[in-house]
């Protein structure tokens, strides 16, 4: 059986194609990696890597062993997780991909509390993701709408409903609109996520109204910027009701709902996790997300 630290060194060299980069990734001296690779090659009786210019490439034997090194490391990780679960220990790393508009406020608080409860857990949080990226496989994706990526199960966390808002400063000099048809007479701050040829708004008593696409000097896909522009009195725009209520709580007197009762169709907030059995850290984090869902998302 090969030394696991030597297998890790070989795997890092395969990934980075450079002794310097692999040593940096493992936070180990280059001399240590060289020594472990030499010992592994001696144990196997085969040369695994060769240098071509400034890069390391696999030999034929290296290509064969690279497949098994992946399996050895995966098995080692699974065995470690199984032993830790006996004592309900949460360790390792979670890689999360989260929509930028979900991070501030809600998720940052969930993450902080979860990491306080599990002091040895590491979190890697990203806000950009391409479904076509077959190499990168995050543990969990939290996104607004979207179909489930291949190999992932979808779970709905809740809904956002958008409504129109203005600031008291803006309405101090203009009449407050009472029906969506009046919005065409006001400067419009366009939230790109809701931009359509037309936007369907609904009222529990008055039915539906199709709001045409309106000209806008400012278009943004960032909720914080959208709310700031509205609060500064630049015009009227859409915000999720949950986000607007939180913004108003943090900044009292900054936002006023317009055309009361009219809202967009619900927009799904989903999380996606891999099929199959999950490590304890992921199962507990998914439970934490479920428990932390705001009531306004229902």
UniProtKB/Swiss-Prot annotation:
Gene Ontology biological-process annotations: DNA-templated transcription
Keyword DNA-binding: yes
InterPro entries tied to this protein: LysR_subst-bd (IPR005119), Tscrpt_reg_HTH_LysR (IPR000847), WH-like_DNA-bd_sf (IPR036388), WH_DNA-bd_sf (IPR036390)
DNA-binding region(s), chain positions: 19-38
Keyword annotations from UniProtKB, A to Z: Activator, DNA-binding, Transcription, Transcription regulation, Virulence
PROSITE patterns named among the record's database cross-references: HTH_LYSR
Domain HTH lysR-type: 1-59
Recorded GO MF terms: DNA-binding transcription factor activity; sequence-specific DNA binding
One Pfam family named in its UniProt record: LysR_substrate
Physiological role: Transcription activation of the irgA gene. In the presence of sufficient iron, transcription of both irgA and irgB is negatively regulated by a fur-like protein. In low iron conditions, negative regulation of transcription is removed, and production of IrgB leads to positive transcriptional activation of irgA.
Similarity section: Belongs to the LysR transcriptional regulatory family.
Protein name per its UniProtKB record: Iron-regulated virulence regulatory protein IrgB
Organism the protein comes from: Vibrio cholerae serotype O1 (strain ATCC 39541 / Classical Ogawa 395 / O395)
Organismal lineage: Bacteria, Pseudomonadati, Pseudomonadota, Gammaproteobacteria, Vibrionales
């Amino acid at each position: 059986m090969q030394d696991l630290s030597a297998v890790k060194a070989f795997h890092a060299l395969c990934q980075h194609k450079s002794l310097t980069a692999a040593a940096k990734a493992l936070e180990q001296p280059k001399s240590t990696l060289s020594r472990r690779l030499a010992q592994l090659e001696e144990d196997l009786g085969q040369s695994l890597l060769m240098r071509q210019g400034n890069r390391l490439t696999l030999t034929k034997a290296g290509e064969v062993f690279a497949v098994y090194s992946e399996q050895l490391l995966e098995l080692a990780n699974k065995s470690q997780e199984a032993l830790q679960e006996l004592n309900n220990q949460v360790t390792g790393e979670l890689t999360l991909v989260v929509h930028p508009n979900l991070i501030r406020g809600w998720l940052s608080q969930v993450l902080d509390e979860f990491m306080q409860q599990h002091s040895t857990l590491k979190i890697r949080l990203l806000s950009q993701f391409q479904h076509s990226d077959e190499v990168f496989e995050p543990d969990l994706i939290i996104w607004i709408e979207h179909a489930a990526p291949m190999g992932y199960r979808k779970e709905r966390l809740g809904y956002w409903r958008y409504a129109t808002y203005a600031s008291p400063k803006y309405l101090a000099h203009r009449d407050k609109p009472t029906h969506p048809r009046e919005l065409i007479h006001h400067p419009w701050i366009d939230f790109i996520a809701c931009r359509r040829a037309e936007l369907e708004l609904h009222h529990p008593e008055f039915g539906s109204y199709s709001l045409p696409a309106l000209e806008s000097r400012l278009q943004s896909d960032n909720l914080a910027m959208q709310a700031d522009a509205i609060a500064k009195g630049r015009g009227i725009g859409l915000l999720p009701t949950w986000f607007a209520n939180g913004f108003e709580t943090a900044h009292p007197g900054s936002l006023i709902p317009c055309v009361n009762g009219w809202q967009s169709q619900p927009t799904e907030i989903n999380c996606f996790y891999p099929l199959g059995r999950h490590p304890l850290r992921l199962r507990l984090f998914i439970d934490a997300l479920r428990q932390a869902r705001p009531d306004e998302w229902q």
